[in-house]
Amino acid sequence: MIVMFQKPRGTRDFLPEEMKKRRFVENKLREVFERYGYKEILTPTFESFELIAKKTGEEIRKQLYVFKDHGGREMALRPEMTSPVVRFYLNELKNLQKPLRLYYFANCFRYERPQAGRFREFWQMGCELIGCKEPLADAEVLNLAMDGLINIGLDFDVHIGHLGVLKGVLEKFNVSEEEEVKIRRLIDKEDYDNLKIYLTQILGEEKKELIFEILKFKGSREVLDELKEILKDFPKSMEAINNLEEILEFVIHDKYTINLGIARGLDYYTGMVFEIYGKKGAKQICGGGRYDNLIETFGGEPTPAVGFAYGFDRIMMNIDDLDIEEESILIIPVKKDKELIKKSLIIADKLRKAGKIVELEIMGRKLRKALDYANSRGFKKVIIVGEKELNEGKVTVKDMITGEQKLIGIDELTNF
C-alpha cells in the first residue's frame, strides 16, 4: 500500500514515548516559573503581519509564513512570542498594577532550512517581566532562566552582555540607527569578515579596531574593570557597564561568562542580553534580555520589560535519557463474555479512580495472545479476570517481570 501523504518538511510527529519526555520537561519548567510567581498566558497562533514584521528583524522577516485571510487582511504565523505577548499586554493587561510576571509555552513558525536543532515548526517556552526597570528585574529573569534548567538537570553555560556598551560607542562615533542595526545583525550572524569591511568603510581603521576589541571581551566579571579603562571617555558605555554590574550583584548563580559579542537577532533589545548554551546537540537553548522600547513602539505608554525564551526542542536535544517510570496495568477478561467484560470495566474504573494507569484488553484475544501483547508493550503487571476467581471475589495478578501469579481480592487491588 502506498502512503499518499507525508508530514510537511521541517515538521515532526512525536511518538508517545517522546511526548511523555516532553511533557515531563515542560512540567518541570512550569514548576519553576510558578514558584517565581509567573502566570501562564497564550496568544493566537497567527497575528497581523504588521505586528509581527514591525520589530522582528530582517532575517526573521524573510522566514515568515504570511497569508491573506478571506477578508484580505495580511496575517503571519508567529515566529516568536515576545511581540504577541506585548500585543496581548496592550489589549488586556496594561491597566493592571505592575510588575506583571507572565509565561507561555507555544509553537512558533519560521521557514528555515531544516537541519539539526532547526525546524519550521518549533516550540518556545519563556517568561516576560513587564513594568520594572530596576536591575533586580533583569537579575530575576536571569536567575529564573538558570533555575529552570537546573530543575531539569541540564548542564549549561550562560553568556551575559549589554547592548548599551557598544551602542554608547557607536553613538559617539555618530553612527546612524540604520547603520547600527546592520552592525548588530552582522555581529549576531558572527559574520566578522563583512563586519570588518563595513566598519572600515563607515568609521575607518582605528575606530573599527576599538569596536572589535570590545566584541572580544569575554570572561569573568573582572573583565568589566578592564573594559571601563578602555571606555572611560564614552559616558553612555560606562552607564551600561555600571548597569550590568548592578544586575550581576543580584544574580545568585556564579556560572556565567561576560560576553560583549552578544547582539541577539531581534531588533527590540535595548540593554542587558544573554544567551544560554547546552553542552551537546543544538548549542543555543535560551536567549533573552531587556526591551524597554517595544511596548511604546506598538502604541503603548513607555514601559520597561525584560524576558527570555527557551528553545524547547533544543533543550530536548540536550537532555540525556529520562527515567520516567509510569507503571501501567493491563486487564484481561479470559474470554469474550459480556459479564466478564462489565466486571473488568468496574475493576478498571476503580483502579483509575485510585490514580492507576489502566488499559483494558478490547481486541478479544485469547489469554496467551493477550499476555504476549502485554509483554511486547512493556506492561509490568496484568490482571486476569476469570469466572471462577470472580465468584470468590478475586482476580489473578501476574507480574510480567518475574512471572509470579497470585490471587488478590478485588477490594485489595488498589493497594497492590
UniProtKB/Swiss-Prot annotation:
Keywords: Aminoacyl-tRNA synthetase, ATP-binding, Cytoplasm, Ligase, Nucleotide-binding, Protein biosynthesis. The gene is hisS. It is found in: Cytoplasm. Its main location: cytoplasm. GO terms for molecular function: ATP binding; histidine-tRNA ligase activity. This is Histidine--tRNA ligase. Its EC number is 6.1.1.21. InterPro entries: aa-tRNA-synth_II, aa-tRNA-synth_II/BPL/LPL, Anticodon-bd, Anticodon-bd_dom_sf, His-tRNA-ligase, HisRS-like_core, HisRS/HisZ, HisZ. It comes from Methanocaldococcus jannaschii (strain ATCC 43067 / DSM 2661 / JAL-1 / JCM 10045 / NBRC 100440) (Methanococcus jannaschii). GO terms for cellular component: cytoplasm. Pfam families: HGTP_anticodon, tRNA-synt_His. GO terms for biological process: histidyl-tRNA aminoacylation; L-histidine biosynthetic process.
